[in-house]
Amino acid sequence: MDAESVEPFLVYLPIPQRVVVLVLLGLWLWTWFLKVSVSYYDVSKVIVSNESTGLPYFNTSTKIHQSSLKLFKSISRVIIPWQLVCIILFQYSFTNNVSNKLLWFFLNVSPLLELFYIFAMILRSSAMVARCFKRILWVADIEPKPYRNNYIIISDTLTSYSKPLVDLAIYATFLFHDPTNVKCQVERYENAISLNIDVLVGVLPSLVRMIQSLREFTRGRSQKKDGSQLFNAFKYAGNIPIMLVTVYTRYYNLGPLGMMYWFMFWNSAYSFWWDVTMDWKLELFDFVNGDTSVNNNNSSNKADGLLRSILLYRKNAWYYSAMALDFILRFVWFWEYISGHSVFYGELNIFWLQILEIIRRWIWLFFKVEVEYIATTEGGKMDE
């Protein structure tokens, strides 16, 4: 294969290897989230862990952070050198047209083995995480509190990784078809796309969250709770029309692209409103609920009608910045559409957008977990 016909970025970071990078990024951001959050509240009241402190002067929240940091370091010590060796070998072999099939088999299968190692380490490190993953992937289950937040964090994180999962699925299809092919890591396998494997994999995380929301709606109705989870299910269902239009356009030269953009706009707008109003319980766009468990007393924050009465992170600017960033990142596709330009070109731009979505999810996590902590410690009823 001619190296000049491939984007330079793919030679430096092949598609499956960048999925590995994104997983490492997510683990690092999770560890950073814990480091920051434990300074403000006890995360262990929201996130259930099977860890025991072992030391009386360490609270459980600190122990969770230390365990996560230890896990991240253990994974990084193996994966980063492994990945660097594979990338250097790939660059040399690809640019010099090396045709050794055994070498290419090793290079092509390595990203899959790296990911297998990462997730094996994660699941082995925590029986609780393994339990949640098993129930999520098997029947899209979600247990009630105190385990509910574990399921939400994992499942919503998977939705932010939907596009990297698509890349992984296309690469894996190519790998199983021809594991010694030079193009396996730099080309999107046409057979996988023609079979719409990318669409099916891309919509799965949203389907899981939709089913979980419907389960909670059914559970809540029997307990005479509000029906907010039904509207949460609508949010995740918003991805389905986009996927259907994508499939349609593949079989017809002229598809309803205008309709797809309208679906995308509605989905981004509704998801942004849900993040701010329902997940973070901020009042800026709260046109539905006049009162919640985190907005049930008089304070300067509540009086301005923009935030809420209890703010654990203290500085109002952090909340306004989070709302602004969430809005920008939810609509990043729209800015590219109306401008006709992207920040980068081709696969590098795709990688950039995937990084931004993971960062958006990281920002979301701070305020979602904060709200759940307030609801738990204040003892008030909170809309789930």
From Swiss-Prot:
One of its GO terms (cellular component) is endoplasmic reticulum membrane. It is a multi-pass membrane protein. The chain crosses the membrane at residues 19-36, 78-94, 102-123. Its main location: endoplasmic reticulum. Residues 189-384 form the EXS domain. It comes from the Eukaryota. InterPro entries: EXS_C. Keywords: Endoplasmic reticulum, Membrane, Protein transport, Transmembrane, Transmembrane helix, Transport. One of its GO terms (biological process) is protein transport. It is found in: Endoplasmic reticulum membrane. The keyword ATP-binding does not apply. Required for the retention of luminal endoplasmic reticulum proteins, affects glycoprotein processing in the Golgi apparatus. Belongs to the ERD1 family. This is Protein ERD1.
